């Protein structure tokens, strides 16, 4: 007997029959079994008698020699999504569960794990004090490093001038043309208060730089002032701005060189020799951010291969612990490195990772997989696990992985890595860092409305986490080679004491960043006889040109400039050293005494839910990189697909169903999402009467009570998010990310308008209009639909809602939620139907006192004409609030980072299949960057996947209906016939191609124009 993954026991013959049948229809046995179960369940639910089992499973049918032609498969919505949910082991499930757990819970668990025994704590504090004291009292660093350190210390990110310098450093080096560079300099320098920095630093370079920036700032800010003398104008005109440009350019390049070991791997290896002679080791990183195109990924792959060859030869047999190594960024090796593209990552990225690792093994140099954003952690663990069980890598201990102490999951990740090392019979190199993406993790969680942060909101909690994790790593020396990356003297000293005095080569190592940590580790690496600690330090050494430096440089500037950074604080002589090297466990306990609870989050960093303070709640999102959330969503989607969705007119009194029309999924014509019936003229008349009769009752309802009802509706809508997502995906062709955003926006509208009338709103001063007609679009069938209605209801108006013809089902659910929340049935009514019939009857009725419309400019103009001649009882025009389309443009000059431009263009132009009124239509590029930008844009477009939005992998869904598809394709063909270059490309597989033929899909399209007149 065998057991399927669904737990169904089958004899071997039946299993073979299922396998054979599944192969004939190009499906998996697992899919076929689930399909049979779903079909049988549906028959049971719709029948009073027990249906016979399908022949395939009952054994009633025999296989013939010639396979019959399979019948057309019934469409099962969201089955593909369900098949993409990944099984998890106990240890992996624990990691996921800790993703965004409350800080109070996480920190309380960490404290005891991080606490140092009293003798160790005392020794660690003493050593940390000595290290910090020497670091602070040593002579100012000489040469380039000292200049940059002084400049960064003086111009911190808390000042306008510091921000200006960071902006310059981030952008200036990539701008190819002088005019744009001059414009950027004027923008960033002219408003700085540079005088305030004169004389504050003991560094001659910093003071000279300040005087230069002051003079530069005056030159720039007064360049166009009428009071400036002609002679000064001539000086500036002839040499001023070029001189400024050269000076600032030199300063920025100086700053860049501070953090980069060399522009090429050969140069970096040569530059490393000096510190290698002192006992330092190196791990080289080829600079660059995430690949956006296949060409980017291939270029990074070649760069890593060349680097491994060069590093391997330079290692000359020193081995993984004593010799140099390499660090690789997985997002550089694949343009779609994300959970949503899991299968592609495993099929395409993994072979590249394996190839690089085998090459590193050939030279016996360590290869570390760098840590990136939090949502990529778990997919990186899957890649690591697969790598660890490769037969060709058996017995080799050079595989390394980076973990981030600021992540709440970090201790559990270590437990998993220890287990992985045990199962794969190897010793893993684990680099423990504090984390370099803190700002973006906080912002992303806030923007996406997630339940919490993946990282700690207080730096001291990260320090506690680091110690707890360090103890875990040191406890299993046979399984883990710990690599402690820190610039903090107390952390360094604590690890030194915890590891003990019986150090042996290969026990552990420290690590630091090139350009930041060398002064501290000059005291650590070297012989005891020379006053050193005789512990190895490996320098993380970025390699690349100044043009590839940008994002890395910003992270380093943020790290240096943060007022909680040890690197920043050590230079602040007003800060006592005892405070600088305080034990973080003690510091957290003091905080707990002051605040009454352990682990409270930073008071100035509210949870995403509380982002807007007491005014209103932030809407809750859904994390599509969280395996537990995906499993929950999958279950809800399958259940949603079994519901019989209907959109009937929803009046004060119930109506008969009558003859109904199917609502078809635009991505899959075989999928009938539900049924709709258009409101009859008589029902529209009844609704108008009810709206008039109920208007005074709703107006008399206190604003605070109206607000409470809208708040309840928001809570209800949020609780039903998953089933609403299911309708939006099938009825409106929304991708999952779009559908989540749609529900969130609707919830936000309800909270927002409730907040507007809850406090400072009185019936005496804010009188309603009366019955208001709300006509909403299909591109935001829940968000704009809800927003219009919520605004009208909050102000005390009765509402007649006509949804778009294409999306009545989601509108019906929105109205049902409002009614459940307490809006009286006659106050809000749903009238599905066409604009020519239902819409015309509503807007043409004299009892209507206001119209809210979102849609085309053409229809808005018609509405304006129709109601312009009508006046209300007080002789005022009937208000029309119309939101229409436009021709949206993006203007890009050469100061813009090309990668960011491409990301933004893809999101604005092609997200929602380009069907937003705010969607990008015209991209205007500066000549100097046009070719490069277009090349990258085409490559990124080719990586997008267009298909059924019911799959997690889909980036671009269908346009709303066949009429829209025909109109768009006609325009594209017209441009082709005029000789305009047209580019269309998406990633294609056989399943997508079949869908494109039946669904209403239009590939993302780029058309090159010479003139706006061609639009």
PLM region spans:
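Positively charged, amphipathic and often flexible ligand-engagement surfaces
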Residues: 63-618
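Rossmann-like NAD(P) dinucleotide-binding subdomain of oxidoreductase/dehydrogenase enzymes
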Residues: 729, 755-902, 953
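Short, positively charged interaction helices/loops
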Residues: 43-67
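Short, basic amphipathic alpha-helical segments that act as recognition/interaction helices
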Residues: 28-51
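Terminal low-complexity tails and localization/encapsulation signals of metabolic enzymes
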Residues: 531-533, 543-544, 548-551, 555-689, ...
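ALDH superfamily catalytic-core signature
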Residues: 820-822, 844-846, 850, 858-1012
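Long, K/E/R/D-enriched contiguous segments that form extended
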Residues: 292, 359-363, 374-388, 395-401, ...
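Short Lys/Arg-rich basic patches
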Residues: 1-10, 19, 23
């Amino acid at each position: 007997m065998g057991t399927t993954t669904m737990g169904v026991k089958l004899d071997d013959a039946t299993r073979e029959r299922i396998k054979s049948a599944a192969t004939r229809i190009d499906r998996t046995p697992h899919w076929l079994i689930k399909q049979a179960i779903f079909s049988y369940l549906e028959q049971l639910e719709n029948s009073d008698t027990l249906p016979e089992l399908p022949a395939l499973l009952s054994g009633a049918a025999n296989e013939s020699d010639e396979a019959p032609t399979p019948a057309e498969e019934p469409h099962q919505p969201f089955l593909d999504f369900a098949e993409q949910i990944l099984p998890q082991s106990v240890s992996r499930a624990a990691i996921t569960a800790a993703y965004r757990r409350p800080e109070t819970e996480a920190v309380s668990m960490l404290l005891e794990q991080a606490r140092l025994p009293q003798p160790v704590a005392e020794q660690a504090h003493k050593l940390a004090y000595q290290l910090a004291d020497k670091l602070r009292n040593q002579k100012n660093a000489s040469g380039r490093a000292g200049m940059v350190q002084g400049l960064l210390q003086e111009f911190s990110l808390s000042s306008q001038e510091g921000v200006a310098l960071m902006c310059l450093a981030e952008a200036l080096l990539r701008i190819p043309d002088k005019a744009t560079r001059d414009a950027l300099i004027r923008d960033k320098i002219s408003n700085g208060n540079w005088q305030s920095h004169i004389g504050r630093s003991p560094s001659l370079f910093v003071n000279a730089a300040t005087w230069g920036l002051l003079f530069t700032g005056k030159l720039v800010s007064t360049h166009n002032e009428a009071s400036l003398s002609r002679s000064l104008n001539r000086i500036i005109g002839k040499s001023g701005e070029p001189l400024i440009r050269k000076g600032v350019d030199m300063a920025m390049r100086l700053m860049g060189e501070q953090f980069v070991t060399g522009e090429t791997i050969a140069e970096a290896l040569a530059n490393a020799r000096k510190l290698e002679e002192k006992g330092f080791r190196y791990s080289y990183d080829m600079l660059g951010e995430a690949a956006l195109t296949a060409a980017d990924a291939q270029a990074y792959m070649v760069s890593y291969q060349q680097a491994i060859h060069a590093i391997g030869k330079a290692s000359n047999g020193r081995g993984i612990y004593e010799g140099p190594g390499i660090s690789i960024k997985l997002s550089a090796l694949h343009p779609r490195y994300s959970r949503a593209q899991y299968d592609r990552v495993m099929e395409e990225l993994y072979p590249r990772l394996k190839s690089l690792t085998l090459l590193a093994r050939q030279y016996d140099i360590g290869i570390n997989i760098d840590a990136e954003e939090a949502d990529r952690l778990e997919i990186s663990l899957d890649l690591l696990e697969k790598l660890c069980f490769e037969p060709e890598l058996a017995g080799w201990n050079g595989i390394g992985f980076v973990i981030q102490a600021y992540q709440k999951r970090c201790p559990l990740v270590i437990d998993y890595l220890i287990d992985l090392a045990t199962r794969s019979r190897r010793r893993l190199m684990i680099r423990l860092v504090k984390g370099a993406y803190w700002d973006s993790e906080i912002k992303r969680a806030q923007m996406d409305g997630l339940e919490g942060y993946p990282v700690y909101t207080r730096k001291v909690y990260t320090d506690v986490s680091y110690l707890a994790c360090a103890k875990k790593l040191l406890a299993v020396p046979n399984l883990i080679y710990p690599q402690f990356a820190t610039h903090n003297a107390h952390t360094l000293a604590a690890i030194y004491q915890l590891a003990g005095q019986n150090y042996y080569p290969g026990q552990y190592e420290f690590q630091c960043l090139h350009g930041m940590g060398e002064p501290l580790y000059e005291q650590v690496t070297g012989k005891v006889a020379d006053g050193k600690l005789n512990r190895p330090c490996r320098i993380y050494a970025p390699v690349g040109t100044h043009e590839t430096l940008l994002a890395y440089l910003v992270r380093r500037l943020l790290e240096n400039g943060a007022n909680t950074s040890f690197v920043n604080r050590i230079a602040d002589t007003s800060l006592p050293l005892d405070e600088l090297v305080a034990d973080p466990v003690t510091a957290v306990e003091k905080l707990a005494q002051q605040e009454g609870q352990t682990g409270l989050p930073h008071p100035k960093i509210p949870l995403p839910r509380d982002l807007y303070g007491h005014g209103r709640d932030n809407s809750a999102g859904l994390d599509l990189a969280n395996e537990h959330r995906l499993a929950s969503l999958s279950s809800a989607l399958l259940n949603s697909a079994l519901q019989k969705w209907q959109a009937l007119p929803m009046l004060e009194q119930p109506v008969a169903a009558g003859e109904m029309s199917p609502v078809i999924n635009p991505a899959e014509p075989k999928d009938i999402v539900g049924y709709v019936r258009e409101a009859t003229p008589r029902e529209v008349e009844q609704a108008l009467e009810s709206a008039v009769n109920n208007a005074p009752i709703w107006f008399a309802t206190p604003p605070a009570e109206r607000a409470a009802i809208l708040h309840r509706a928001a809570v209800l809508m949020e609780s039903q998010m998953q089933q609403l997502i299911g309708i939006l995906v099938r009825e409106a062709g929304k991708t999952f990310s779009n559908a989540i955003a749609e529900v969130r926006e609707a919830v936000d509208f309800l909270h927002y308008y409730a907040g507007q009338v809850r406090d400072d709103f009185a019936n005496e001063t804010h009188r309603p209009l009366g019955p208001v007609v709300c006509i909403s679009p299909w591109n935001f069938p829940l968000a704009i639909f809800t927003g219009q209605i919520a605004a009208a209801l909050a102000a005390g108006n009765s509402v007649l809602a006509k949804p778009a013809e294409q999306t009545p089902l989601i509108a019906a659910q929105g109205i049902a939620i409002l009614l459940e929340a307490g809006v009286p049935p006659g106050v809000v009514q749903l009238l599905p139907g066409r604009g020519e019939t239902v819409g015309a009857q509503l807007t043409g009725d004299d009892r209507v006192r206001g119209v809210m419309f979102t849609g085309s400019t053409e229809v808005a103009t018609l509405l304006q004409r129709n109601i312009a001649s009508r006046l209300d009882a007080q002789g005022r025009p009937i208000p029309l609030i119309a939101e229409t389309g436009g021709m949206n443009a993006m203007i890009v000059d050469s100061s813009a980072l090309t990668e960011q431009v491409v990301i933004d263009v893809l999101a604005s132009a092609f997200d929602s299949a380009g069907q937003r009124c705010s969607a990008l239509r015209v991209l205007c590029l500066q000549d100097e960057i046009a070719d490069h930008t277009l090349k990258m844009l085409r490559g990124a477009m080719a990586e997008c996947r267009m298909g059924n939005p019911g799959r997690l992998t889909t980036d671009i869904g269908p346009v709303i209906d066949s009429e829209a598809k025909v109109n768009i394709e006609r325009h594209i063909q017209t441009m082709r016939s005029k000789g305009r270059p047209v580019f269309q490309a998406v990633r294609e597989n056989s399943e997508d191609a079949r869908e494109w033929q039946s669904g209403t899909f239009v590939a993302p399209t780029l058309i090159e124009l010479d003139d706006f007149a061609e639009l």
